């Protein structure tokens, strides 16, 4: 089977990619995520962040992509801007943002282990999820939706929002920019037409 992703020596096939996207989509729905909701991802490009991005799109929700290099104040402002109730946070960055996130009981913070898909998970320091806060582990998140039926794919609509990214803020505060499914499809077509695999 063709390889879809490579990450620190781990190779993930297209079949595994689709299976993981479907699993994450079921878990998102089990936490009440619906079409049009904004789900924040603050992570590097790990396989799990990719699964989450496509699972969010499958439901018809919008991925709010946040740089881990933001200050805690910038992060909370971007989350509030789109009323995101669910945050997927890479474990390496949670200590930096913890104080800004744990005070809001309405939000759920899913802790994504950055080395989860590689053998390095056995030797890397593990973030300890605080059971007394709004944090949950990636493993718990996946278990929450495991028994659900597969999520239906939200049908295509022209210019349907898929992701929100942010400008650099060189002349002031960074601004949210909503990207449509069409913009991502055009990018994929450009790669295909250039012979890039």
Predicted region positions:
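N-lobe entry segment of adenylate-forming
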Residues: 1-31, 35, 59, 116-132, ...
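Conserved AMP-binding A3 loop
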Residues: 13-15, 162-188
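Short beta-strand elements of ligand-binding domains
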Residues: 43, 66-67, 107-115
């Amino acid at each position: 089977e063709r390889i879809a992703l490579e990450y620190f020596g781990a190779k993930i096939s297209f079949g595994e990619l689709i299976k993981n996207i479907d699993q994450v989509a079921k878990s998102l729905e089990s936490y009440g995520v619906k079409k049009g909701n904004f789900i924040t991802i603050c992570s590097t490009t790990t396989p799990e962040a990719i699964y989450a991005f496509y699972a969010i799109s499958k439901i018809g929700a919008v991925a709010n992509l946040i740089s881990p290099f933001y200050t805690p104040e910038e992060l909370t402002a971007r989350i509030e801007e789109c009323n995101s109730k669910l945050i997927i946070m890479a474990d390496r960055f949670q200590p930096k943002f913890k104080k800004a996130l744990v005070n809001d009981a309405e939000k759920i913070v899913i802790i994504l282990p950055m080395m989860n898909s590689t053998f390095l998970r056995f030797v890397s320091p593990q973030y300890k999820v605080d059971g007394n806060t709004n944090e949950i582990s990636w493993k718990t998140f996946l278990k929450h939706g495991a028994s659900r039926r597969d999520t239906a794919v939200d049908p295509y609509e022209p210019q349907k929002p898929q992701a929100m990214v942010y400008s650099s803020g060189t002349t002031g505060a960074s601004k949210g920019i909503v990207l449509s499914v069409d913009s991502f499809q055009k990018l994929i077509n450009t790669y295909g037409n250039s012979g890039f695999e």
